Curated annotation (Swiss-Prot):
The lineage of its organism: Eukaryota, Viridiplantae, Streptophyta, Embryophyta, Tracheophyta. One of its GO terms (cellular component) is cytosol. This is Pyruvate decarboxylase 2. Its EC number is 4.1.1.1. GO terms for biological process: aromatic amino acid family catabolic process to alcohol via Ehrlich pathway. Disulfide bonds: none annotated. It is an enzyme of class 4 (lyase).
């Protein structure tokens, strides 16, 4: 049960540590050493200590935007073997990239400058907090001598109080540390990193700009491996929770299981599948849990998303007389405007450290992974719900065949995306109609899938794609991005080319913010059309490997995909798909109307 983070292999040396950005070859970093090499007394600086600790927990890429308060720190991060500095176009994308990297690797890091950089990355860190991702946000701070004086510094709002950035981060991180002296710097750094890993949340670490190059005896010692004390269940509480749940489920006629997004933070995906195997229950996932458990299991029935669930899934879940939700998040988006047809007295809610059984007892200090494992040993086999699903299930039809040179429909696009998926691929779905179209994709074993549902920040996918692809070198990542979202964060396609990534981006150009149109339409949802392939070609500028294509019909799409998977397989492939402005999934139409109704509820009587 003990977790020694120091046993996580460090990354091999980057080929070009001298420049901010990925090495020209961008070859993946094989993990080689369990512990960073000891440094000499002359190298025992604060900056190198931080770099070594990042490598030790599995970070081999730090997404950064340089600024005068963090330049010396960046020098020391670059000097660390095994640590790459990936220079991003802006701080928001650096934060999104750290988010995507944490999804692929388990932990991510970004480095920005004081206040102007920190407040720019804040939105991305809030998103990582909402998704329970350990991201270490490092900010270069003012000279330690300036704290406590009446000096007014640049990159501030003109006050001698330098705490504005810290106060902003207090609400979106689980731990904050401001390092202004060397005496306890090692302890502050280690505590921040350990807290991020333990809580699975972002942390904020500010380091005064005059400290990274300074040595201190605490930095020359061989660092103690991180030790995260495991969270253990209260044995009596665990036994009582299992007993109450077994009684609840065993008397049900057609119970079902539903996996939620907190399976990730609880590291309970395998325990959930083991429970499926032991119980024989039909199981579904909430939309934000897609990709966390296998979809190739015979008892998988799809995505449960209320009125916009995949075919026949909602009927089975909502007609069950008992449903166990493992790690759910019920918000207005996931509940389709609070329109779920679920009853509390039929539900068992299992959170990472808590179990609630129907209208009855709640059991605290019960770890989800341990609870599901114990439950699997005692629950009776019951395949009734799955057998009901098989009786009513009708295989999904195919989109209508396209006429020659017929304008491309979005459902035809996703028919072809489905054929591209395998165990060596991953899908990034941007906020918008891609949420709904990608939910219908059937993921092969080992195929990754990520999207940001709780926070739902448009533009997230561009930076997240950069970070995920950098962290998962063994996968070819396919991103589905709307034109409105792309306009928010497009610049870091540049960084993808610089890092020699070979992701495939489908840019769906339908002329506006389609998801907003279906919630509440207005002229503000119409955007200026760009020449998207021309933009990416300009960013490419003949440097690195990048290929673009603009497609308007199925024949052109088929040809473009063939090129992306064949001749251009080593290139970043950008395929602009021209779609009609009203070409949306039926799920978005239904979801949008229900969320709109929830948003427009009148005030309660006072």
């Amino acid at each position: 049960m003990e977790t020694h983070i120091g046993s996580v292999d460090g990354a091999a040396a980057a080929a070009d540590n001298g420049a901010v950005g990925c090495p020209a070859s961008a070859v993946g970093c094989p993990m080689t050493s369990a512990r960073p090499a000891p440094v000499s007394a002359g190298e025992a600086s604060l900056g190198r200590h931080l770099a070594r600790r990042l490598v030790q927990v599995g970070v081999s890429d730090v997404f950064a935007v340089p600024g005068d308060f963090n330049l010396t720190l960046l020098d020391h991060l670059i000097a660390e073997p095994g640590l790459r500095l990936v220079g991003c176009c802006n701080e928001l994308n650096a934060g999104y990239a750290a988010d995507g990297y944490a999804r692929a690797r388990g932990v991510g890091a970004c480095a920005v400058t004081f206040t102007v950089g920190g407040l720019s990355v804040l939105n991305a860190i809030a998103g990582a907090y909402s998704e329970n991702l350990p991201v270490i946000c490092i900010a270069g701070g003012p000279n330690s001598n300036d704290y406590g004086t009446n000096r007014i510094l640049h990159h501030t709002i003109g006050l001698p109080d330098f705490s504005q950035e810290l106060r902003c981060f207090q609400t979106v991180t689980c731990h904050q540390a401001v390092v202004t002296n060397l005496e306890d710097a090692h302890e502050q750094i280690d505590t921040a990193i350990a807290t991020a890993l333990r809580e699975s949340k972002p942390v904020y670490l500010s380091i005064s700009c005059n400290l990274p190059g300074l040595p201190h005896p605490t930095f020359s010692r061989d660092p103690v491996p991180f030790f995260l004390a495991p969270r253990l269940s209260n044995k009596m509480g665990l036994e009582a929770a299992v007993e109450a749940t077994v009684e609840f489920l065993n008397k049900a006629v057609k119970p079902v299981l539903v996996g939620g997004p907190k399976l990730r933070v609880a590291k309970a995906g395998k325990a959930f599948v083991d429970l499926v195997d032991a119980s024989g229950y039909a199981y579904a996932v909430m939309p934000s849990a897609k990709g966390l458990v296998p979809e190739t299991h015979p008892h998988f029935i799809g995505t449960y998303w209320g009125a916009v669930s995949t075919a026949f899934c909602a009927e089975i879940v909502e007609s069950a007389d008992a449903y166990l939700f493992a790690g759910p998040i019920f918000n207005d988006y996931s509940s389709v405007g609070y329109s779920f047809l679920l009853k509390k007295d039929k539900a068992i809610i299992v959170q990472p450290e808590r179990v609630i059984v129907g209208n009855g007892p709640a059991f605290g200090c019960v770890m989800m992974k341990e609870f599901l494992s114990e439950l699997a040993k005692r629950v009776n086999k019951n395949t009734t719900a799955y057998e009901n699903y098989k009786r009513i299930f009708v295989p999904e039809g195919q989109p209508l065949e396209s006429e020659p040179n017929e304008p491309l429909r979005v459902n035809v696009l996703f028919k072809h995306v489905q054929k591209m998926l395998n165990s060596d691929s991953a899908v990034i779905a941007e906020t918008g109609d891609s949420w709904f179209n990608c939910q219908k994709l059937k993921l092969p074993e080992g195929c990754g899938y990520e999207f940001q549902m709780q926070y739902g920040s448009i533009g997230w996918s561009v930076g997240a794609l950069l970070g995920y692809a950098q962290g998962a070198k063994d996968k070819r990542v396919i991103a589905c991005i709307g034109d409105g979202s792309f306009q928010v964060t497009a610049q870091d396609v540049s960084t993808m080319i610089r890092c020699a990534q070979n992701s495939i981006i489908f840019l769906i150009n339908n002329g506006g913010y389609t998801i907003e149109v279906e919630i509440h339409d207005g002229p503000y949802n119409v955007i200026k059309n760009w020449n998207y392939t021309g933009l990416v070609d300009a960013i490419h500028n003949g440097e690195g490997k990048c290929w673009t294509s603009k497609v308007k019909c199925e024949e052109e799409l088929t040809e473009a995909i063939g090129m992306a998977l064949g001749e251009k397989k080593d290139c970043l492939c950008f395929i602009e798909v021209i779609a009609h402005k009203d070409d949306t999934s039926k799920e978005l139409l239904e979801w949008g109307s229900r969320v709109s109704a929830a948003n427009s509820r009148p005030p309660n009587p006072q």
